[in-house]
Each structure stands twice: as C-alpha cells, then as structure tokens.
C-alpha cells in the first residue's frame, strides 16, 4: 500500500498487534518492531490530509538541520516551538534556574491545571531570554550534537569534521550509481551530549532513470505526532536535493524500528482513522535558487493543501 493509506494502515497495525510497553517518558506505548511505508513523490507532496500538518514548521526545522544549527534560537525566530521542551528541560534542571519546581513538567502539565499555568509562564520567560540574551541562548538554547551537527560537522578521531550532507550531494552529482549515498546522524560517541539521541538515524539516496529516491531508517517513531513531520521533512529534503542535482523525484521509503503510539494519543489516532483521505498538495520550489544551502523558508510554497482539521496531543519528553 502506498501513500497516506499506508500510514493509516500502520496505525491500525499497531492497534491490532502492538505490544503494550513502558518507555523512557513513563507515558506507555503500543509498539511494533519493523515496518515500512512508501510514497511516490510524483503523486503529490506527502503532507498528510487526515489531519493538518504545519508545513512551515516542517520546513523551518529542516532548514535548521541543513544549516548545521543546533540552537533553538533560529527556530524561535521562525515561530517554531517543536524543540523547546528539550532545551527547557536542560534549563530547569540547571543550578542557574531559581524558579518553581518543574520536575516531570511534561506529564504534570497534562494532569495539573495550576501547574500547567506555571509551566507555560516559565516556558514563555525561557523563550524570551533565548531570543534576547545571547549568552543565555548559547548556554541553554543549544541542544548539543543533534541532527544539524552530525549532518554538517561530524567530528572524526583526527579532530577534523565531515560535511556529510555536502558530500552526499557531490556524490549524487558525480557518481549517481553509487551505493554509498548515505548520511548518518547516529554517532555513538556523541549520544551522551545530545538533548535527544537521533530518532531518524540514517538515510540513503538512490538514483534511477533520472529520479532521486530516499530511504530513511527511523529507530524510534512517535507515529501520531512525529511521523507525519518526518514524512514531510524527508520528502522535502529529497525534493531539494533533486532540485540541486537536476533530477526528478522518485520514492520516499520510510523504514521503522520501534513504531509506537503513546497511550495518551489513542483517542486522537482513532479520530484520525475515521477521516477520509484527500489529495496531496503540490510543492513549489523557487527556481531562481539552486543550492540547498541557499534556500530560505519563503523559497518553499505548498499549494492546494486541503486537510482535515489539526488534532492536538501532548508531547512525551
């Protein structure tokens, strides 16, 4: 099964055969191991239609990765809050933090309305300081050796760096039949310094008949909240690299390790499964820019996107 139906079938499969498991966040999940879905990128841009997926958040996060940035300040400047909780956790667990107790803020904010008000107030103060205070942003806005660092500045044992993204684009242009068009974000040495070890760990490109395809291996997949973003993000990355390399797009193949639905997302997924699939939108890339490294948010436009309404759900931190 291709396209959005494959995603919905994954949700159904997790409900049908998934194992109930504990997890790092103490939320609990329904989980399966080993699954694959596929999208033909010539049949529209895979921004799910059974709920609204905010394209500008997807695009600004990807551009953040592409820039090699690891500080949430760039994201906040683009009204993107999807990484805030991990930076905030570092702040409230530090000796410098003197505010109210924020232990287990992810779960407590869902269960305690009074605490949630405190949490929201502290988060807004944190965001403001990140945007306005350079030294504070340098210390508490940085997430460590996460995706952007590994993609663009992988450290070697020789104290040199490897720009994996630049190298893979060069490889696609000069040796399209290579089986080594690979970028890895999983660096065992750096795992302890990351705010969150990479969930989408490795991707590989494949050129055939003038078309560029991409396969992603994702070790851990939050199927309701994260996976719709991941699908759109790697589809966008494939489009951008194809654009630079003078290729058409082929398939995006999404391979999962632990694919799970959090216990507090079950009702939301059930709502989504009741909705009818609509046509995918189209992606328009500014033709006046060629290099992926020159792209800005305004160079990427989605047209004819007509999704069902968004479905809110808590994030597990």
UniProtKB/Swiss-Prot annotation:
Sites where the protein binds dUMP: 24, 179-180, 219-222, 230, 260-262
Pathway in which this enzyme or protein is active: Pyrimidine metabolism; dTTP biosynthesis
Active site, renumbered: 199 (nucleophile)
Single GO molecular function: thymidylate synthase activity
Enzyme class: transferase
Alphabetized CDD domains for the sequence: TS_Pyrimidine_HMase (cd00351)
GO BP of this protein: dTMP biosynthetic process; dTTP biosynthetic process; methylation
Domain of life per record: Bacteria
Residues annotated as binding (6R)-5,10-methylene-5,6,7,8-tetrahydrofolate: 222, 316
Location in or out of the cell: Cytoplasm
Signal sequence, start to end: none
InterPro entries tied to this protein: Thymidate_synth/dCMP_Mease (IPR045097), Thymidate_synth/dCMP_Mease_dom (IPR023451), Thymidate_synth/dCMP_Mease_sf (IPR036926), Thymidylate_synthase (IPR000398), Thymidylate_synthase_AS (IPR020940)
The keyword Transmembrane helix belongs to this UniProt entry's keyword annotation: no
Keyword field: Cytoplasm, Methyltransferase, Nucleotide biosynthesis, Transferase
Gene3D superfamilies documented for this protein: Thymidylate synthase/dCMP hydroxymethylase domain (3.30.572.10)
Cited PROSITE patterns: THYMIDYLATE_SYNTHASE
GO cellular component, one term: cytosol
Catalytic reaction(s) noted: dUMP + (6R)-5,10-methylene-5,6,7,8-tetrahydrofolate = 7,8-dihydrofolate + dTMP
Record family assignment: Belongs to the thymidylate synthase family. Bacterial-type ThyA subfamily.
Function of the protein: Catalyzes the reductive methylation of 2'-deoxyuridine-5'-monophosphate (dUMP) to 2'-deoxythymidine-5'-monophosphate (dTMP) while utilizing 5,10-methylenetetrahydrofolate (mTHF) as the methyl donor and reductant in the reaction, yielding dihydrofolate (DHF) as a by-product. This enzymatic reaction provides an intracellular de novo source of dTMP, an essential precursor for DNA biosynthesis.
Assembly and interaction partners: Homodimer.
Record-given protein name: Thymidylate synthase
Organism (species): Oceanobacillus iheyensis (strain DSM 14371 / CIP 107618 / JCM 11309 / KCTC 3954 / HTE831)
Gene: thyA
